[in-house]
Amino acid sequence: MAICYARFMVPEPSIFEIDAEAEEAADAEGMADIAAGRVVPHEEVSAWLDTWGTPEEKPAPETWRK
């Protein structure tokens, strides 16, 4: 007797399925950070990225984290 497992399988959510409320909250948080000046200048990010893949590679500065 064959058993059909398809009815027991739960599909994983697609990367394109988003929680609209969570996305709105994240956007609002980001905009508030920008408005409050909590940003990292492009030049600093670029200089940090230039170290990637080199013997002098540096971790992201702690001051960049919330």
Curated annotation (Swiss-Prot):
Disruption phenotype: Cannot be disrupted, suggesting it is a functional antitoxin. No visible phenotype when the relBE2 operon is deleted. Keywords: Toxin-antitoxin system. Antitoxin component of a type II toxin-antitoxin (TA) system. Neutralizes the effect of cognate toxin RelE2, but no other RelE or ParE toxin. This is Antitoxin RelB2. It comes from Caulobacter vibrioides (strain ATCC 19089 / CIP 103742 / CB 15). The gene is relB2.
